[in-house]
Amino acid sequence: MTDQPILMFDSGVGGLTVLREARVLMPDRRFVYVADDAAFPFGAWEEPALRTHILDLFVKLLDRFAPAISVIACNTASTLVIDALRERFPGHPFVGTVPAVKPAAERTRSGLVSVLATPGTVKRQYTRDLISKWAQKCHVRLVGSDRLAGLAEVYMREGFVDEEAVRAEIAPCFMEHEGLRTDIVVLACTHYPFLVNRMRKTAPWPVDWIDPAEAIARRALSLLPPVDGALPQGEPDIAVFTSGKTDFAIGRLMQGFGLSVR
């Protein structure tokens, strides 16, 4: 079915950064955005419980929406459960979100790179394996932030954020060594690009902030079968919140992203 939607999954509103890029690349496609806000933040969960929760949830999501592809627009979930999802649902394509270590290693001039992520992503062996594979010649600092995802949620809902709190969370990313400075910070959580302007403002010096959203969207596009002619016009793009609870601010935010809350 060519009118099958693309499913975007995150713990909250962070995956909207990926949706935004996907819409540019796939303007004729229909999207279903699923925010598992009942389980937010994923980083607070024990790994086995979170893995089971997401696998069980996807049984329901795939049955309800029958998507053409599912994008796990969350680093914490992807590094934990993407392989298990592919094993559990072998006939369905999944696109994961992993820290953009390879492009960071290719771009850095100083060799000092920081990966800004949730504590869950920082502690995963998956993340360390990426560094070992792609950034052996770099000094990579893993920085786990307990607060940034929540600050991004507040910012997107309310339109303001405590800049001093942002400054404190990003401060460990900035290293100086033998006259060299950190020149790349990988945003390894899809929530973080919403705060990148505040990060630039509060950073001690300019760096290149790597947002993987476009690369994720391009990967999803590459896995979709080609379409002959125009796609049929069907249901509108929708947003689903697993808590079943949305307020005016969330409704307005989703509307701004062209999503109807269901």
From Swiss-Prot:
Matches recorded under SUPFAM superfamilies: Aspartate/glutamate racemase (SSF53681)
UniProt-recorded Gene Ontology molecular function terms: glutamate racemase activity
Pfam families xrefs: Asp_Glu_race (PF01177)
Family listed: Belongs to the aspartate/glutamate racemases family.
Function per UniProt: Provides the (R)-glutamate required for cell wall biosynthesis.
NCBIfam families hit by this protein: glut_race (TIGR00067)
Protein name as it appears in the record: Glutamate racemase
Phylogenetic placement of the source organism: Bacteria, Pseudomonadati, Pseudomonadota, Alphaproteobacteria, Hyphomicrobiales
